Amino acid sequence: MINIKVTLPGFNENLTISQFTGNEESVLDDCKFWINKKIENPDIWFVFENITSEKEACAIDPKKVVFLSAETSYPDNHFLKDPRKNFLKQFGYIYTTYETINKSIKDMPFLPWMINSNHGDSIYSPSPRDVNYFLELKDLKKTKTLSIICSDKDFTEGHKKRLDFAYGLKEHFGDLIDWFGNGINPLDQKWDGISNYKYHISIENKNKDYLISEKLMDSFLGLSFPFYYGAQNTSDFFPKKSYFRLKRAQKNFRRKIYL
């Protein structure tokens, strides 16, 4: 068994990843995940963004300590600033969407799906819709046409543009589109705003290579065809015909939905 230490800030050690492993033992294949728990001699250590306390340590080869970036709304120079550059020096591998001075590997943000939740602790809570459920899911009855999930968050330029776009879509489509989101029309779980809909609009914080978040994955999991605004290289990860790429609000958008 490979023992993997995982540091996940913002959550306690009692969280469960059963949605993603399909069991309560935090085991996937031959890997055991120790989430925010003390383990003295792990085989590998994944750190999501930061550590959970002022100091955190274990006995491990430094080359096996891996940094994983998850945030999608950082400024482009976030990891070029001195405090972050120094922080990244201690990792054997760095996976991030953003530019770094340190040697790094470009990849998508390391985010869980959120279709069974609405952020916070509910992300890592048990659900009957776990990985095994989604692996077997082939069809869902669609009773509605179009939805979007976009909160009223507006503290970055990307948030403001996304919110403006959502207002424009609602003005254009009217009752054809259902708009959900914290501060707008909250949902306990995103499943309720995706699974009943034939189409779903997914808008990222930025139009940046590799910046592909749960916003697209949740649409796939709910079997709702995504109209997607996000990474230019999305087709490096998903078939081109599995989504429609938006270039902001398009004049022929309504016609394309009925194709």
PLM region spans:
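Nucleotide-sugar donor-binding catalytic core of glycosyltransferases
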Residues: 1-245, 250-253
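Short, intrinsically disordered, charge-balanced linker/junction segments flanking boundaries
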Residues: 253-259
